[in-house]
């Protein structure tokens, strides 16, 4: 279909290039090191922020072949040892304790079963490994949250399953991650209904 195969992937890719979003990426991605797994590689927007000297290899988990194709130009400009993994985050086909860093940016919002995905992330991480993330989340403000709930049904259609009302902090806590070393705020230059973000580096 024209919408799902051409228009929607490009709209999502474009939205992920806004200055506020890019600034969030720059806060966390440079800390990735070793054997790295990126959940929801998309069209490769995180590539410029990786410290190539710290990356042994990068696996891009991306179930969409369309998104994989959109990332081809960015991958041509990268010297990182890279391969795609065409799979879902809820069932990662990698060995337990095999990854040094898992990266997840603006992906938990659209994964059908985020709790299962976080469990899988925890499984593949080595002891001492790190989970690096930045995500938008449910607003703590009643009025903003009400607006999020109102428009979420339409937003999920436009954003390929993106949920506005998922509480990312709560998801992380219930999945056994230590959320003490995380930050959250409304990021400047972004509408409040999509502007409350949480990010951090969590060690296993």
What residue spans do the PLM features occupy?
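Short alpha-helix
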Residues: 160-176
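A short glycine-rich, Lys/Arg-flanked "PGG" loop and its adjoining helix->strand segment in the class I
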Residues: 115-127
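Class I SAM-dependent methyltransferase SAM/SAH-binding core
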Residues: 37-91
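Conserved alpha-helix/loop element of class I SAM-dependent methyltransferases that forms part
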Residues: 15-35, 45-49
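A short SAM/SAH-binding and catalytic strip from SAM-dependent methyltransferases
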Residues: 100-113
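Core SAM-dependent methyltransferase catalytic element
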Residues: 177, 182-204
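A short acidic, Gly/Pro-enriched loop at the edge of an enzyme's catalytic core
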Residues: 90-102
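Conserved beta-strand signature within the Rossmann-like core of class I S-adenosyl-L-methionine
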Residues: 128-136
